[in-house]
Amino acid sequence: GKEAYQAKLNAFFDQVNDFWNKAGNGRFNYYFRYIPDLQVIYDCSSRQLEKIYQKSAGFPNHDVLLIIDSILDFDDEESAKGWYCGGGADDLNMVICRSRSKTEHEDLFGIDYFHRGVAHEFGHYRGVTDLYADRIRAKNNPVNHIEYEPDSCVMNSHYKTYKWSSYAVHIINHTAKSKRPRRDFDGFFKQMFPENIQVSVKVKGKKQKGVKLNLCGSRAKFNDLIATPYRTYETDKKGEYLITGVPNLYDSPAPPLHTDELPYNRWFTFLLEAEYKGEKKYVWLPEYEVQQTFFENKDTYQVTIDF
């Protein structure tokens, strides 16, 4: 019944809150507590319910709508199985936790990492992106054939990770007092990018003119790098190049993209290649690393390359 389910939710959110705060390892400026308030035990497609609240304000006195569905018993649910965070009407965030089975009820509360998964989705609610989307597989990297693994974080993998990265902590602290960050921090993700990236190149300790710089972009979902550089630059007589308009390089980048598909219309990581007399050096520029400048009150991210 409803009372028993509310009790189950209360116990579960005790887990979520305990994990959320402990994973901050003393770096949060606030104590965070999510309090479940059971509204309805529904008997319809959870996908249909989700679509209703994408268009209807629904819960003006609440901050997040959590929809739990333990079986894919409606045809429209299978295309949206799994756990994710999305937006609803009036800037309400919705967290959907939907089973992956069409035949058996999945006891989501019985999954030992479910509370960490919900914490991950609530991380999106607070404004943190998926760090795992910055991952590059070596086999999908035609530029230097090296794997890139993002920082350890609940927003990278919640299965076996028990901490927030410094990037996530900064964002969660920054948006902490907002009940609806989508409303109060509109466009925040793009605003975190610095305006510039300053690249400085030295050869044997001396500033080097004419070093070719290639900026190769990576895509979410594919975990790959596009071999054709998105942008190409060259250092000046000071051995420097100032890359400007950085927010628009990463987010909603202008063509040519040299790819037919760019998920979320964003480059998630850039690999900067510097070439001098046939020798090449590489620097990873994932969005979350470059955005750290926002919390340092700087408008330029510094890159130094030594040959």
Which residues are covered by each model-predicted region?
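A short beta-turn/strand-edge loop motif at beta-sheet boundaries
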Residues: 204-210
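Catalytic cores of secreted or luminal carbohydrate-active enzymes
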Residues: 156-194
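The catalytic-center signature of Zn2+-dependent metalloproteases
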Residues: 100-170
